[in-house]
């Protein structure tokens, strides 16, 4: 055993050993002794370790009899403890905390094992789609049985992979090999459910008319104008579409890789729109990018879009973004946007878990431009292509502009072959605000963007889901993403962490190919008035388009929501019964 003189401060940890040291440490760290002399302590091997043991139960029994210098313990249920606490309160007020309980530790878990996090985001959206389209088929009267067992199996498999060492990126290599196989199982199963339920929906709309149509599925709870893509054999009719047979409220564009892009106007909310081809010849539509100027190498220097005047420096970096709607420059004077920086990332401990406060002290530009040119330009989108090299890694980006939204997409492929280096992108913006908004689960949280206190300084890396936003009165900008979670906004600089390649516990973490998209979205008003939430959902959940024959040309919505501040995220069958 141990004597109390050997443990003057006790011990506390998430592995509760239920010994005198543990109990003493819990009592010493308890801050509200004047309010109640009872405190709840949990015991057992945590961190996936198996829970309480026989030895712990015996130690607890002995401590109930009393150990000198150690508070007396009593076995009870958590519910009973709160009843005791309520009785002891005697109208006293317990202190409360309003705001975020920020953990000043393990900031790297927002980014480590990026492929796993991308799988998770994709599967969450895909499972939501599978549930909704299954409901849609049922509500529209199709001969389709709601696949409750398959959906439950997929959700449970997805939740297993949200275990606290898998999703954060702090497991060994074998775990991620198994996890990738399981995510692919979910994608295959949920993808099959989506295809079968959509086919069932289309069967309800069948008619003898054999005219060719485009069927557009929108799983989101708001009507939207957005881009949909057909690839492979489905895209072979691009030339026919461009020659005027496409429906009048749809623009079309062929991409260099043979896919066909469609700009769908006003796709119905949580439903399907069917559009018949038009026989009239349409006028040539203006491309998104105009007034393009290039240097002697053919690299873009400046151009206009419906929303911006863009300028690039001799290194292929964005040095000007003038918002034509507001006639204002978005970037800080002398700064560059989408600045890709590589930082040395060697935390003092817990390599995959941590990012240390001094990581910014050693950094390099992800320079070495190999190619930079206008890759595609049409009525649906205009895209620049740029390829860069840093040491043994290559990064390719398509920077895409659109006619219907001020969102600028950075579609990224990175062949990453570095260790203990961290990649971030930054946008220094000419927007003044003392706080910013970050998305959390089904909500958002405000955080300061200054460094007044040590608490503020400690928030050099925070968590966000699909978006973060910096707005002043009447104007702002958001950074959106399709699979990233670590970010930071300080002194009007918005930064998103893209890759963190630690070497423990997985020596090959984050090596190889990465594909992801992040976006800059300047907007009027704050994030609510500027439509940031909808734009982030649109990035993560694109429209689905199919070529069909012999179906009714009509639109059908499961629901419509008039208020922009209300969003229906999930529609599914009840767990029991046949209700929704």
Model region roles, listed by residue range:
Residues 1-205, 219, 473-546:
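Catalytic grooves of carbohydrate-active enzymes
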Residues 10-19, 69, 184-191, 195, ...:
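C-terminal (or distal) subdomains of carbohydrate-active enzymes
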């Amino acid at each position: 055993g141990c004597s109390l003189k050997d443990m003057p401060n006790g011990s506390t940890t998430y592995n509760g050993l239920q010994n005198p040291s543990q109990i003493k440490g819990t009592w010493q760290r308890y801050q509200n002794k004047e309010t109640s002399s009872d405190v709840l302590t949990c015991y057992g091997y945590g961190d996936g370790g198996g829970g309480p043991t026989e030895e712990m139960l015996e130690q607890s029994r002995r401590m109930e009899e009393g150990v000198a210098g150690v508070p007396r313990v009593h076995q009870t249920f958590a519910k009973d403890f709160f009843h005791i606490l309520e009785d002891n309160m005697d109208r006293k007020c317990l202190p409360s905390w309003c705001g975020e309980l920020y953990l000043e530790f393990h900031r790297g878990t927002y980014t480590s094992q990026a492929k796993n996090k991308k799988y998770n985001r994709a599967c969450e959206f895909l499972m939501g789609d599978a549930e909704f389209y299954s409901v849609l088929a049922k509500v529209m009267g199709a001969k389709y049985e709601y696949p409750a067992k398959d959906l439950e199996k997929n959700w449970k498999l997805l939740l297993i992979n949200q275990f606290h060492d898998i999703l954060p990126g702090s497991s060994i290599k074998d775990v991620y090999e198994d996890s990738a196989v399981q995510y692919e199982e979910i994608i295959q199963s949920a993808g099959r459910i989506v295809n079968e339920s959509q086919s069932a929906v289309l069967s309800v709309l069948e008619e003898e008319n054999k005219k060719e149509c485009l069927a557009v599925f929108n799983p989101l709870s708001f009507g939207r104008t957005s881009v949909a893509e057909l690839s492979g054999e489905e895209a072979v009719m691009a030339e026919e579409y461009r020659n005027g047979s496409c429906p009048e409220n749809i623009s079309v564009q062929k991409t260099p890789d043979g896919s066909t892009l469609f700009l769908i106007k006003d796709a119905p909310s949580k439903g399907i729109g069917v559009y018949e081809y038009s026989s009239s010849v349409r006028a040539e539509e203006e491309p998104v990018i105009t007034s393009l100027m290039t240097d002697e190498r053919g690299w873009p220097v400046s151009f206009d879009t419906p929303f911006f005047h863009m300028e690039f420096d001799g290194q292929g970096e964005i040095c000007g973004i003038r918002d034509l709607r507001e006639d204002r420059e978005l970037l800080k004077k002398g700064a560059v946007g989408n600045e890709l920086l590589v930082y040395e990332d060697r935390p003092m401990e817990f390599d995959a878990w941590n990012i240390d406060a001094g990581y910014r002290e050693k950094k390099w530009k992800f320079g070495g431009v190999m190619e930079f040119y206008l890759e595609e330009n049409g009525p649906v989108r205009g895209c620049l292509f740029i390829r860069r090299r840093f040491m043994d890694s290559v990064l390719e980006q398509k920077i895409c502009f659109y006619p219907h939204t001020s969102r600028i997409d950075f579609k990224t492929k990175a062949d990453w072959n570095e260790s203990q280096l961290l990649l971030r992108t930054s946008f220094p913006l000419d927007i003044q605000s003392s706080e910013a908004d970050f998305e959390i689960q089904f909500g958002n949280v405000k955080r300061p963007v200054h460094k007044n206190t040590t608490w503020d300084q400690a928030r050099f890396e925070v968590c966000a889901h699909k978006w973060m936003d910096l707005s002043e009165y009447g104007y702002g900008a958001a950074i959106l993403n399709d699979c990233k979670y670590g970010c930071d906004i300080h002194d009007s600089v918005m930064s998103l962490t893209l890759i963190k390649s630690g070497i423990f516990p997985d020596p090959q973490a984050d090596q190889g190919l990465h594909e992801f998209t992040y976006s800059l979205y300047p907007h009027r008003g704050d994030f609510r008035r500027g439509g940031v939430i909808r734009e982030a959902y649109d990035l993560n959940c694109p429209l689905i388009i199919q070529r069909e024959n012999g179906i009714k040309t009509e639109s059908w919505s499961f629901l419509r929501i008039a208020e922009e501040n209300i969003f229906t995220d999930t529609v599914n069958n009840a767990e029991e019964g046949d209700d929704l």
